[in-house]
Amino acid sequence: MIFPAIDLQDGRSVRLYKGDFAQETVINPDPVDQAKQYETAKVGALHLVDLDGAKAGKPINVDIVKAVRAAFTGILEIGGGIRDKAAVDLYLGMGVDRVILGSVALKNPELTKQVIAEYGAERIVIGVDGKNGKVAAEGWLDQSDVPMTDLIGAMIEGGAKYFIVTDVERDGTMQGANEDLLGNLQKEFPTARIVASGGVRNLDDIKSLEAKGVMDSIVGKALYEGTITLEEIAEYNQQN
C-alpha cells in the first residue's frame, strides 16, 4: 500500500528537507482541504505527521487531525509527539486507525508494549527513524547509538508488526529509498511489515522495494513534484 503524507506545522501542510524544521516548503495552507482532495481521489490511505508535536513532545495539531479524520474515510495514521498513553488514547479515541510511536518506543519500551497489548499490532505502528542504521528520536533532533535492528527485534518480541523505517538522510531528497537497508531489515525480520519512508520517487521505486519484500511505502515530496500522482496511488492501492 502507498500512503501519501501530509506533514503539519503551524496549522499548515509543509514539507521538510532531511527533517530540518528550518527548511520547510508550504504545500497547502489548509491541510483539511488537501485531505479532501485525497478522499476525492480515492487513495484509501493517509500518513499524517504532527511536526509541532514531534518538537513539543505532545500532540499539538489535534483539531486538524480531527477534521482530517472527518474528511477522509480511508486508513489514517498519525505520528509526531505521541509519547504517552494519553496521546495514544486521544487519537485512537477520535477514530484514527493507527498511531505511530517513535521516540517512546526507544525510550519507554514497556509503555509501547503495554499499548500494543491493549490495542493490537494493527493499530500501533513503530516509527524507526535514523541514519547509518542507528535510531534517531525527538523529531530527529537526537541521534542515538541504538541499532535499528535492536529496536525492531525488541518491539517484535513486544508484539509489534508494522515498522515505518525512515532514512533521515533520504527524506525529502528524491534520491530513491535506501533499498539495501529496507530489504535487509525485511529479510532479517520476516514476520515484520517494513514500511519504506524517505526518498521514494515513483512507482518504479515502489516496485523495486516490493521485489525485496517491502510492500508498503510512504510518499511525500514525490507527490508534490509530480513523479507519482494521486491517480497512480489510488489505482495501486485498489489493486493491492
Each model region followed by its residue ranges:
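Catalytic cores of alpha/beta
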Residues: 72, 76-98, 180-216
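Short, acidic/polar
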Residues: 27-39, 83-89, 144-154, 206
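Conserved, mostly hydrophobic/aromatic
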Residues: 7, 38, 46, 91, ...
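Active-site-adjacent beta->alpha loops and helix N-cap segments on the catalytic face
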Residues: 2, 53-69, 83-89, 103-125, ...
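Short secondary-structure boundary segments
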Residues: 6, 50, 103-104, 128-130, ...
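Conserved anion-binding
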Residues: 11-14, 18-22, 92, 96-171
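Active-site-adjacent loop and "lid" segments of alpha/beta metabolic enzymes
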Residues: 17, 132-144, 173-176, 184, ...
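N-terminal beta-alpha supersecondary unit
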Residues: 13-59
